[in-house]
């Protein structure tokens, strides 16, 4: 079988029964189930949600995005083998660990296939919850330009690149474009301070002000759980992005949960510990791919300058990346996933047909 056949690139054309448009993101597609199918699954599977809760099928692809663009490889390899399976396996592992340690639930109700989640519809908090343990990446670039205040927090002089910070920093940004919030620019992914959030509790979609403390607590505790677990494999949890939302349980009680994905190579930086001690940075995350892109193209400003998005999209669509680069990404993702979960990943030879078969035979969701 051709290597490209093992990659799930298009994930928004599955014959899943739905009466709403399929939502397609950079990597995941969401199929909202009909009221009848949601109610049937809640009853038949015993999900801990209200009987009338909306459910969705979330299918992850093997596409690779960076700098807000989706990138493709040569020889028809338009995704990264095993990437989606690795991301879901890692998130599943951390979500279970969070729950086992009494932190909070996630939006995932069922895992029919390594590339598929059944999820409960959540009301998202409009914050990208970012935690940083080291100064690197965009934060370091800003620091070298003289910035010392990040999201209302002042950091000390004299820090060096890739140095561990004195304490874990919470540097949130907006999730999407928020309008009408005094002091918050109307643009995507804008840094905000704790005081910004406190001034606009409802604007950021929090139910009450005390949940600002709760989200920070869950972010810090989740970060520590992952950091401690990775340290056992001599891996360093550098920084990460979490997302939060609200759902109701079967009794109708509202709760704040983790959602999207957590602790993955897409949403986090992970460094190899032994290399870091030797003064070298070996990325075990998508950051390695970002650095490759910056070094590969003669004008890296296109990838960094948000005023050059038209050029950036053209760059991504006009350039097929070497197959060896796509396989390097695959090895990084699959390798770190297998370290985290402690076993080999099963990567499907025909993922699309597998998904259809399972959702038809075990969930009666295929039309």
UniProtKB/Swiss-Prot annotation:
Which biological process terms from the Gene Ontology are attached to this UniProt entry?
A: 'de novo' IMP biosynthetic process
- Quote the HAMAP family the UniProt record gives: SAICAR_synth
Q: Which family does it belong to?
A: Belongs to the SAICAR synthetase family.
**Would you tell me the protein name for this molecule?**
Phosphoribosylaminoimidazole-succinocarboxamide synthase
User: What would you give as a GO molecular function for this chain, any one?
Assistant: phosphoribosylaminoimidazolesuccinocarboxamide synthase activity
Q: Which UniProt keywords apply?
A: ATP-binding, Ligase, Nucleotide-binding, Purine biosynthesis
Q: Pfam families, from UniProt? A: SAICAR_synt
Pathway this chain belongs to: Purine metabolism; IMP biosynthesis via de novo pathway; 5-amino-1-(5-phospho-D-ribosyl)imidazole-4-carboxamide from 5-amino-1-(5-phospho-D-ribosyl)imidazole-4-carboxylate: step 1/2
Q: Name one GO cellular component term.
A: cytoplasm
InterPro entries in the cross-refs:
SAICAR_synt/ADE2_N, SAICAR_synthase_Vibrio-typ
> Is Cytoplasm found in the keyword set?
no
């Amino acid at each position: 079988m051709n290597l490209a056949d093992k990659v799930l690139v298009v994930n928004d054309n599955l014959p899943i029964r739905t009466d709403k448009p399929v939502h397609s993101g950079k990597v995941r597609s969401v199929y909202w189930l009909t009221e009848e199918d949601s109610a049937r699954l809640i009853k038949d599977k015993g999900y801990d949600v209200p009987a009338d809760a909306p459910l969705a099928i979330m299918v992850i692809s093997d596409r690779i995005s960076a700098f807000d663009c989706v990138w493709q490889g040569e020889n028809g390899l338009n995704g990264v083998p095993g990437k989606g399976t690795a991301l879901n396996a890692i998130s599943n592992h951390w979500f279970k660990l969070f729950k086992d340690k009494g932190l909070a639930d996630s939006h995932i109700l069922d895992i029919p296939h390594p590339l598929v989640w059944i999820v409960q519809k959540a009301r998202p908090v409009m914050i990208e919850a970012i935690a940083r343990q080291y100064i690197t990446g965009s934060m370091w670039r800003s620091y070298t330009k003289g910035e010392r205040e990040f999201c209302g927090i002042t950091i000390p002089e004299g820090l060096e690149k890739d140095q561990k910070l004195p304490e874990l920093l919470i540097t949130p940004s907006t999730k999407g474009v928020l309008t009408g919030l005094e002091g918050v620019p109307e643009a995507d992914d804008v840094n905000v301070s704790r005081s910004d959030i406190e001034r606009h509790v409802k604007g950021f979609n929090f139910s009450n002000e005390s949940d600002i403390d709760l989200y920070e607590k869950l972010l810090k505790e989740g970060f520590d759980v992952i950091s401690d677990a990775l340290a056992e494999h001599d891996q360093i949890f550098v920084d990460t992005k979490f997302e939060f939302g609200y759902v109701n349980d079967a009794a109708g009680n509202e709760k704040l949960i983790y959602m999207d994905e957590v602790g993955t190579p897409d949403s986090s930086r992970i460094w190899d510990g032994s290399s870091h001690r030797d003064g070298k940075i070996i990325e075990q995350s998508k950051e390695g791919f970002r650095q490759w892109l910056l070094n590969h193209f003669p004008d890296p400003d296109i990838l960094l300058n948000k005023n050059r998005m038209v050029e950036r999209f053209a760059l991504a669509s006009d350039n097929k990346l070497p197959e060896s680069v796509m396989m390097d990404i695959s090895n990084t993702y699959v390798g770190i996933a297998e370290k985290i979960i402690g076993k080999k990943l099963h990567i499907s030879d025909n993922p699309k047909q597998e998904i259809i078969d399972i959702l038809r035979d075990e969930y009666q969701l295929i039309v």
